[in-house]
Amino acid sequence: MKKFLLGLLIPLVVSCSTGGAISTNEQSFIAGNGVATFIPKAERKAAPAISGPTLDGGNFEATPGKVIVLNVWASWCSPCRAEAPALQELSVAHPEVQFLGVLTRDSLVAARAFVERFEIKYPSLVDDSILLKFHGQLTPNAIPTTLIIDGSGNVAARISGEVTYSALEDLIERVKSNE
C-alpha cells in the first residue's frame, strides 16, 4: 500500500512543480527582477517596426526619430499595477518620448479597466505578436518588461520586471544623451 501511495505522490508533486520559476498566472509566465540592461550605442541592434491596433480601437505607428518607451504589461500582473502610475507620470514629464504599452495574455475588457483605473493616456498595442520580432535582441522576457528604443530605432535598454520612476527616468536620460 505504501509503494502504491508513493507511486501516486511522486507524479503529483512533479506535476505541481514550476521548476523554480516564479509563476504569475496560469500560463506560468516569469516575473522579472527589475534588472536594467543598457546597451552602448555602438552595440545596439535595430528594433522591429512598431505598429498595430491599439486598445482604444485606433492604430499606432512609431514616429521616426523619437525615443520610445515600450512597456509589456497585463492587468493581472501585480508588478504591472505597481509600476503603472510611474509610467503614466513619466509619459507626462517626457512629452518628447513616445510611451507605448503592449498588452499580452489578457482580455480586452480587463485591459480597458486597467487603463481607466490607472488613467493611462498613452496607447497600448493589443497584438503582442510584435514581441516575437525582438528575437535575438534584448527580448521582452518577463511581465512586465520595459524596452527603450533610441531615436535611431535601435534597442537601447531593457528593464525586466517592475520599473521605478527614478530608474526609468535615468535610463531615458542616458538614451537621450547618448543619441
What are these regions (language model features)?
Residues 1-49, 179:
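N-terminal targeting signals for export/organelle localization
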Residues 42-68, 135:
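A short beta-strand-turn-helix
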Residues 45-47, 63-65, 97, 119, ...:
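Extracytoplasmic
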Residues 59-81, 87:
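Short active-site neighborhood of thiol/selenol oxidoreductases, capturing the structured segment around
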Residues 72-74, 102-105, 127-128, 160-162:
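Active-site-proximal beta-strand/loop segments in catalytic clefts of secreted hydrolases
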Residues 81-119, 129-134:
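Structural microenvironment flanking redox-active thiols in thiol-disulfide oxidoreductases
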Residues 116-121, 127-179:
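Thiol/disulfide oxidoreductase modules built on the thioredoxin-like
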